UniProtKB/Swiss-Prot annotation:
It comes from the Bacteria. GO terms for cellular component: cytoplasm. Substrate binds at residues 104, 141. Coiled coil: none annotated. This is 2,3,4,5-tetrahydropyridine-2,6-dicarboxylate N-succinyltransferase. It comes from Shewanella halifaxensis (strain HAW-EB4). Homotrimer. It catalyses: (S)-2,3,4,5-tetrahydrodipicolinate + succinyl-CoA + H2O = (S)-2-succinylamino-6-oxoheptanedioate + CoA. InterPro entries: DapD_Trfase_Hexpep_rpt_fam (IPR005664), Hexapep (IPR001451), Hexapep_transf_CS (IPR018357), THP_succinylTrfase_dom1 (IPR023180), THP_succinylTrfase_N_sf (IPR037133), Trimer_LpxA-like_sf (IPR011004). Keywords: Acyltransferase, Amino-acid biosynthesis, Cytoplasm, Diaminopimelate biosynthesis, Lysine biosynthesis, Repeat, Transferase. Its main location: cytoplasm. It is found in: Cytoplasm.
Length: 274
């Protein structure tokens, strides 16, 4: 793995000279190997080690290199065709493979090759970009978007129209991360490498980026780039120092309790694949 990392790093430094026609076969093979590893979950752009998230930047660089290496191709899709550099993840799947991997994919969900989809996940008509990692038991609801290299935990619900930001454009240092057992409400956006920690509930219509103030009304503490574990967050405003206007903020109104869990709990009936 270390030798592969070093080769990817070296190729990335020379990326300006790389095109689909000039790329060395060995570089193409290395990038294809990384994409395959991301696709199966053998590798992931970020992982939690000893309670801290670590980003493997070289894997992200391989994803970026793929856009320099692979040429556009015609892609079949339902009643139409597409033209893109990245093939679709399920292009060569048959019924046996869908059943083996225990996932449901509702048309016209679009999932790019190089993204990982865990068992007992449900993909409604949604979009998952390459490099993303969607863990087991998660629901990606209608018109939700999982951006490039985003990390989605186990038993997460991404409600209708949710946007989870990617890292490729604009280029971000770290991926957006939604930890296990989180609920993201309809039309909310979490971007710019923000981490929503385990068990949190984001109400609908909440927008969180790195510069968004995340205000805990119980303690008065303000967080940036991180929603503490078990938080219930709604959209709100905080007054300016001069008191003449207010600016948008995400407000932590309480910690998740049994009443909250009852409202946003996972419906196991919807996760049955067999």
């Amino acid at each position: 793995m270390e030798a592969l990392r070093q080769r990817i790093e070296a190729a990335f430094e020379a990326r300006a000279e790389i095109t689909p026609t000039t790329v060395e076969p060995s570089v193409r093979a290395d990038v294809e190997k990384v994409i395959a590893m991301l696709d199966t979950g053998e590798a992931r752009v970020a992982e939690k080690i000893d309670g801290q998230w670590h980003v493997h930047q070289w894997l992200k660089k391989a994803v970026l290199l793929s856009f320099r290496i692979f040429d556009n191709q015609v892609i079949d899709g339902a009643e139409t065709k597409y033209f893109d550099k990245v093939p679709m993840k399920f292009a060569d799947y048959d019924e046996a493979r869908f059943r083996k991997e225990a996932i449901r994919v509702v048309p016209p969900a679009a999932v790019r090759k190089g993204s990982f989809i865990g068992k007992n996940t449900v993909l409604m008509p949604s979009y998952v970009n390459l490099g993303a990692y969607v863990d087991e038991g998660t629901m990606v609801d209608t018109w939700a978007t999982v951006g490039s290299c985003a990390q989605i935990g186990k038993n997460v619900h991404l409600s209708g129209g949710v946007g989870i930001g990617g890292v490729l454009e604009p280029l971000q240092a770290g991926p957006t991360i939604i930890e296990d057992n989180c609920f993201i409400g309809a039309r909310s956006e979490v971007v710019e490498g923000v981490i929503v920690e385990e068990g949190s509930v984001i109400s609908m219509g909440v927008y969180i980026g790195q510069s968004t103030r995340i205000y805990d009304r119980e303690t008065g503490e303000v967080h940036y780039g991180r929603v503490p574990a078990g938080s219930v967050v709604v959209a709100g405003n905080l007054p300016s120092k001069c008191g003449t206007y207010s600016l948008y903020a995400a407000i932590i109104v309480k910690k998740v309790d049994e009443k909250t869990r009852g409202k946003v709990g996972i419906n196991e009936l919807l996760r049955i694949v067999d």
